[in-house]
């Protein structure tokens, strides 16, 4: 049983799924490994009493027997996945606000100051960092990063999309998607996670913009008018996304043409509709599953 996490609808933290169970955390930052029978294999907390009171929220990534952890109170550390024991622990200057990507002997994360940081997975030493333009307010959504070949591509709080060489940290290309005025407005700016088919990168925001950009050059393929900060799903030649007011959009991947729009909140009364927002969605061969801020799922 997990201790309660506040604002669960606003969280974007995922457990690590293993062949024989999963790993997650509670509100005090305790990491817990469960087996497939829901029994605790181990549980360990690597925080001091003052740190526990801050209710750290953890990001996980795994390589072999190593679990890499970053959090929103500026710690990052490595844990043995079999025992839960600490391999090493370090502190960053600022809290982290992204997931973690691992590439060979390095891992990457972005902090609240829009700085991409590259660390050595074996001892936590910093290999390099790349600062992008900062803002005066705290971002309201987590930053996203993906790795394609030997290039890491990431977003920041002002909507810049930046591609860097994994080994050197040098910028390959950068695409600003917002005007300079966004620097003062990031408290309500939200951007989706980046997704890619290997040739293009797709993402959207709550400023009514859905982008397709070229992986190699960062040039814009097309932009469409869709207001969404949910992670889009690419399947075949189609992109699926759900707007913040509950409309499913099906988009042709190469040209950006909208193939279909469906109102997923059609059965909600107008008053109720104003009070709910989509949280996330997934699709299979025949169904779409949409979770909402009211705790219900639409299929």
Name every feature range the model reports, one short phrase each:
Residues 1-19, 40-64, 85-104, 126-149, ...:
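Extracytoplasmic beta-rich repeat domains
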Residues 19, 26-27, 35, 71-72, ...:
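Structural signature of WD-repeat beta-propellers
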Residues 35-39, 80-84, 120-124, 166-169, ...:
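Short loop/turn segments that connect beta-strands within beta-propeller blades
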Residues 157-158, 168, 196-221, 228-229:
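Beta-propeller domains
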Residues 217, 255, 285-287, 292-299:
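C-terminal closing repeat unit and adjoining cap/tail of repeat-based domains
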Residues 244-250:
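Redox- and metal-dependent alpha/beta enzyme cores, enriched for Fe-S-associated oxidoreductases
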């Amino acid at each position: 049983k997990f201790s309660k996490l506040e604002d669960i609808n606003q969280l974007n933290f995922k457990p690590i799924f293993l062949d024989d169970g999963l790993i997650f955390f509670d509100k005090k930052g305790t990491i817990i490994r469960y087996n497939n029978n829901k029994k605790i294999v181990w549980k360990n907390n690597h925080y001091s009493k003052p740190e526990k009171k801050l209710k750290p929220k953890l990001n996980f990534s795994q390589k072999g027997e190593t679990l890499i952890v970053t959090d929103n109170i500026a710690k990052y550390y490595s844990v043995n996945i079999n025992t839960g024991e600490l391999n090493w622990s370090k502190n960053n200057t600022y809290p982290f606000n992204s997931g973690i990507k691992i590439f060979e002997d390095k891992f990457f994360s972005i902090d609240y100051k829009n700085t991409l940081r590259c660390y050595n997975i074996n001892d936590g030493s910093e290999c390099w960092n790349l600062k992008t333009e900062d803002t005066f307010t705290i971002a309201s959504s987590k930053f996203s990063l993906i790795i394609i070949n030997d290039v890491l591509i990431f977003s920041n709080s002002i909507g810049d999309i930046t591609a860097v060489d994994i080994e050197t940290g040098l910028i390959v290309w950068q695409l600003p998607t917002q005007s300079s005025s966004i620097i003062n407005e990031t408290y309500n700016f939200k951007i989706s996670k980046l997704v890619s088919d290997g040739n293009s990168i797709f993402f959207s925001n709550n400023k009514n913009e859905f982008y397709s950009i070229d992986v190699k050059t960062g040039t814009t393929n097309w932009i469409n008018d869709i207001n969404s900060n949910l992670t889009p799903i690419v399947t075949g030649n189609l992109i699926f996304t759900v707007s913040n007011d509950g409309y499913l959009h099906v988009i042709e991947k190469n040209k950006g043409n909208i193939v279909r729009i469906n109102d997923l909140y059609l059965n909600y009364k107008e008053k109720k509709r104003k009070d709910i927002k989509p949280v996330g969605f997934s699709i299979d061969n025949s169904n779409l599953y949409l979770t909402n801020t009211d705790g219900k799922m639409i299929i």
